[in-house]
Amino acid sequence: MAEQVVEILVSGGKATAGPPLGPAIGPLGVNIMQVVQKINEMTKDYDGMSVPVKVIVNTDKRTFEVEVGIPPASALVKKELGITTGSQEPKHQVAGNLTMEQVVKIAKMKQDAMLAYNLKNASKEVIGTCVSVGVNVEGMTPKEAQKAVDAGQFDSYFN
């Protein structure tokens, strides 16, 4: 059984037969439109976000299966704030402000894919992502927010 695995990043619910999907799947002998339909069906909840997708193709039987990953933390932060792009100058310009509840919500979504061993550390990873997106947390810069988490200021959210 010869299996080929194609890993791509697609816009949720908006995959097309064009690049990057078409050229990667086309030579493997499966119906590209069926693959696109399946991906769009499985990613429709992530509308507008970049979603990692793994397409596993059995080249002998010409069958496929699709596995959908969780979008990057930066995409989840932007969706939670309702913005399409982060700050162009993250240290000087603020693109938005997350509450600790929103940070914990994102951390719970991503926790299985993170190296963090508890919700508190997963939340700190999400706060770290806020640095590059240019988003503050509870009115503080991400670095200040991480120090506040370490100091126990938000411990009530992690129980």
Curated annotation (Swiss-Prot):
Query: PROSITE patterns from the entry?
Result: RIBOSOMAL_L11
**Which residues, if any, are the signal sequence?**
none
**UniProt cross-references to InterPro entries, sorted A to Z:** Ribosomal_uL11, Ribosomal_uL11_C, Ribosomal_uL11_C_sf, Ribosomal_uL11_CS, Ribosomal_uL11_N, Ribosomal_uL11_N_sf
Instruction: List the keywords (alphabetical).
Output: Ribonucleoprotein, Ribosomal protein, RNA-binding, rRNA-binding
One Gene Ontology cellular component term attached to this UniProt record is:
large ribosomal subunit
The record's listing under SMART domains reads: RL11
Q: Which GO terms describe its molecular function?
A: large ribosomal subunit rRNA binding; structural constituent of ribosome
Q: Which GO terms describe its biological process?
A: translation
Q: Does the keyword Transmembrane helix apply?
A: no
Q: Which domain of life is it from?
A: Archaea
Q: SUPFAM superfamilies in the record, alphabetically?
A: Ribosomal L11/L12e N-terminal domain, Ribosomal protein L11, C-terminal domain
Task of the protein: Forms part of the ribosomal stalk which helps the ribosome interact with GTP-bound translation factors.
The record's section on NCBIfam families has:
PRK01143.1
Q: Which family does it belong to?
A: Belongs to the universal ribosomal protein uL11 family.
What name appears for this protein in its UniProt entry? Answer: Large ribosomal subunit protein uL11
Which species is this UniProt entry from? Methanococcus maripaludis (strain C7 / ATCC BAA-1331)
Gene of this entry: rpl11
